[in-house]
Regions:
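C-terminal non-catalytic regions of proteins with extracellular/luminal or membrane-system context
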Residues: 1-357
Length: 357
């Protein structure tokens, strides 16, 4: 009897060992089946389809006739127009109105407005790593004041990083453009050309792009008022003619696998956190208050920039979060500012007005 118990114990132990070994081996073999098949000339799996010409398993996708030429090839102009319409709609549905006091928004048709902040000229449309905004785009200035474009001067730039050397280069996201002209419905405003020229010249030095990424010891690189004045000493004189509203754009780039770390902000910016407004950004906002009785701030980022002070400032009339609107989203922003549509977006969570809360 004792011998039988010993036998069964031995067999049980052996079975348990073989079972465990089989499970481990099976997992390993399954994980490396492609390598094993290549070396042994075996085939672990085979896809069998019942698809036939008479009875297709899948229906072939056929684009709608409105985006096709007569010969059935794709009509690039129509396809781009569809992309413009989609980007426009996404921005309308995604923008969030965080503040609107004194019936500031919507602005009346034909309003004379001043755009302030270098990001009002070179807005962030996408990310340099992850989701990029590539090719032609419609700028905020165009969306507010124009109704057609050939994209001659609005091809998005992006920053390319060499991860071996750490070198960052700025380059066009599209090397060629066929020059097609596209029509759109702008807001019908008149935009201060003086400030557009100022920021155009300043960006020759700053080299901002429409796609950027956060970096250690971050500096949003908003030009100082001294730099603005050096570019055009009489820039403030333009406010009298374009003082119906002052629109300030505040931006922070966003990227896949990139975060703003606590305290990771460049020295000399006047900020202690990367999502806090810098001295130069605050100066731009104060300039907006001098330029107009109506001050509107556009939050051009996917991050929660610290806007508690702006929320509580009685001189800031409206705050509109526009995220990263993509190549054609500024058309939706323009629609909201002129009252053609009502902003219907909502935040997915509580907006933290303090970075370390």
């Amino acid at each position: 009897m004792a011998k039988r118990k010993t036998l069964w114990r031995g067999l049980s132990a052996l079975f348990a060992f073989v079972f465990t070994l089989s499970c481990v081996a099976g997992t390993i073999l399954e994980g490396y089946k492609a390598t094993i098949d290549t070396n042994l000339g075996t085939q672990s799996e085979k896809f069998v389809s019942e698809n036939t010409a008479d009875d297709p398993l899948y229906d072939k996708f056929t684009p709608s006739a409105e985006v096709l030429n007569a010969d059935g090839t794709g009509n690039s102009h129509a396809l781009i127009q569809k992309a413009i319409d989609l980007g426009h709609k996404q921005a309308v549905e995604g923008a969030v109105l965080l503040k609107n006091e004194n019936n500031t928004l919507p602005l009346a048709s034909g309003s004379n407005v001043t755009l302030l902040g270098i990001r009002s000229h070179i807005s962030l449309l996408g990310s340099s790593f992850g989701v990029k905004a590539k090719g032609p785009y419609i700028s905020l200035e165009q969306a507010l004041s124009q109704n057609k474009t050939d994209f001659h001067n609005t091809i998005a730039y992006t920053l390319n990083t060499n991860y071996k050397t750490g070198e960052v280069t700025r380059a066009l996201s599209l090397s060629e453009w066929n020059g097609d002209e596209f029509e759109f419905e702008g807001a019908g405003f008149n935009v201060n050309p003086t400030m557009v020229d100022v920021y155009t010249k300043l960006n020759e030095t700053y080299q901002h792009s429409e796609n950027e990424t956060p970096f250690a010891n971050y500096d949003p690189q908003e030009p100082s008022l001294a730099e603005v004045k050096a570019t055009n000493p009489d820039y403030e004189a333009s406010f009298a003619q374009y003082g119906d509203a002052a629109i300030v754009v505040i931006s922070r780039p966003t990227a896949e696998s990139k975060d703003y770390l606590p305290g990771s902000v460049a020295e000399g910016t006047g900020a202690s956190e990367p999502l806090e407004l810098t001295t130069n950004e605050r100066d731009v906002i104060e300039t907006a208050k001098k330029a107009s009785d109506k001050v509107i701030v556009l939050i051009n980022t996917a991050n929660a920039v610290e806007i508690g002070d702006l929320k509580n400032d009685p001189d800031i009339d409206a705050i509109l979060w526009i995220g990263l609107p993509g190549c054609y989203g500024m058309l939706g922003v323009a629609d909201i500012l002129c009252g053609r549509v009502s902003p219907s977006g909502a935040m997915s969570d509580i907006y933290a007005t303090y970075n370390l809360s």
